[in-house]
Regions:
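Bacterial N-terminal signal peptides that target proteins for export
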Residues: 1-14
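N-terminal signal peptide c-region/cleavage motif recognized by signal peptidases
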Residues: 18-20
């Protein structure tokens, strides 16, 4: 009987440890964006990557329904949100036009592709990145900007959503 009780306790401990590990597995909320110039197209390319769970939770919270990001109508909802929360501005303060190229979704991440057609990356003066910070107060977004052969990294969060690149 003692052996059986011991085994039950071990199994219960293992289950609880696993549940605790799963709960702690997603204790941070982060996104990463890469901005670079494509010499072949003459456009500045923007690639965002976010945790799929965070994007799904955001959309579900905003619209009180399930989202399927393989559905073009649901993609349009995400597009509208991202275009409101992320933008680039020129030296005169005007926003640079960002064209939505598309997105890729897998179990772990949502990758969003945008571009500023016929716009060199050195036209970017200001980056505004508030994606997910309105929903997740601890969201941290990192933007890597490659310009003139050098890489610069900028950090954004609920307290800092806009930075000059110079």
């Amino acid at each position: 009987m003692k052996v059986r009780r011991f085994l039950v306790n071990v199994v219960c401990a293992a289950v609880l440890a696993s549940a605790g590990a799963a709960a702690h597995a997603h204790r941070f909320h982060a996104g990463i964006t890469d901005i670079s110039f494509n010499e072949h197209t003459g456009s500045t390319e923007v690639v965002h990557t976010y945790m799929a769970h965070d994007v799904e939770a955001l959309l579900g919270n905003l619209y009180q329904r399930q989202f399927d990001l393989s559905d073009p109508e649901d993609q349009a909802v995400l597009r509208k949100y991202v275009e409101k929360q992320f933008w680039l501005a020129a030296k005169d303060g005007r926003r640079l036009p960002l064209k939505w190229v598309g997105l890729s979704v897998d179990v772990d991440s949502v990758t969003i592709f945008q571009e500023a057609p016929a716009t060199p990356v050195d036209k970017v003066e200001t980056i505004h990145d508030a994606v997910l910070v309105d929903f997740l107060p601890d969201q941290a977004n990192t933007v890597n900007l490659t310009a003139g052969g050098s890489l610069r990294t900028f950090g954004f969060n609920a307290r800092q959503s806009e930075l000059s690149v110079h």
